A protein has these predicted regions:
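Non-catalytic alpha/beta scaffold blocks inside enzyme catalytic domains
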Residues: 1-155
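Long, low-complexity segments enriched in small/aliphatic residues
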Residues: 139-177
Length: 177
C-alpha cells in the first residue's frame, strides 16, 4: 500500500515546540519589541497559556490580527479585524507540491483586512489581497509549475480547479519526535 508518502508529506500542523520555547525566553527577557500574531491563540492553546498572557502584555507593540476576539486577541495592544476565510483570498500547501487557492465565497461582513494586505499597507505599499496573492503565485508557484502557457491562463485554471501543482516542492527533511 501507500499509507505514507514521504516524498510529498503533509504540511498540516507543523508546530515547532523549539521555536515556541525560544520565543518564550525572548519574551521573558524583554527582547521582543514588536509582535504580530495572526491565526493563533497561544493563551488558550499552550499549556503555559497563563504565563503567555502575562508575557505578551509586556510587549511594547503587540498587534493581533484576528477574525474574532479570542483569549489572546482580547489582551493585545492593537487589534486588527481580519476577514473570515469565506470572505478572503488566500493560499495554502497542505501537501508538499500541491498549492491550493482560496477565493472569497461571500462579501465581507465587516470592515476587515487580511494579514497580507495589512502588512503591505503598513510597509507603505498597499495592495488588495487578490493582487498580493497573484504576485506571490507569479513568483513562487507559476515559475515552478508544470503547466500553463501563460500566467493568466495558469491563474484561470488555478481559480477554476482550486489548486495547482509545483514541480519543485521544497520538502524539509522528515523526522519523528
Amino acid at each position: 500500500g501507500s499509507t505514507l508518502d514521504l516524498t510529498r508529506p503533509s504540511r498540516q500542523r507543523l508546530g515547532d515546540d523549539a521555536a515556541i520555547a525560544r520565543l518564550t525566553r525572548e519574551l521573558e527577557t524583554g527582547a521582543v519589541a514588536v509582535l504580530v500574531t495572526s491565526g493563533v491563540n497561544p493563551i488558550h492553546e499552550l499549556p503555559e497559556g497563563g504565563q503567555w498572557a502575562e508575557l505578551l502584555t509586556k510587549v511594547p507593540v503587540w498587534v493581533a490580527v484576528a477574525e474574532r476576539v479570542d483569549e489572546t486577541a482580547a489582551l493585545a495592544r492593537y487589534l486588527c479585524p481580519s476577514p473570515h476565510p469565506f470572505e478572503s483570498w488566500g493560499d495554502y500547501e497542505p501537501i508538499a507540491g500541491t498549492v491550493c487557492l482560496r477565493q472569497p465565497t461571500t462579501a465581507a461582513v465587516g470592515d476587515t483586512r487580511s494579514l497580507d494586505a495589512s502588512l503591505a499597507a503598513w510597509s507603505g505599499a498597499p495592495l488588495a489581497a487578490e493582487e498580493l496573492l497573484r504576485a506571490r503565485w507569479r513568483d513562487a508557484v507559476f515559475d515552478a509549475s508544470t503547466d500553463g502557457p501563460s500566467f493568466d491562463a495558469f491563474c484561470d485554471r488555478s481559480r477554476r480547479d482550486g489548486w495547482n501543482r509545483r514541480s519543485d516542492p521544497a520538502v524539509a527533511a522528515l523526522h519523528f519526535d
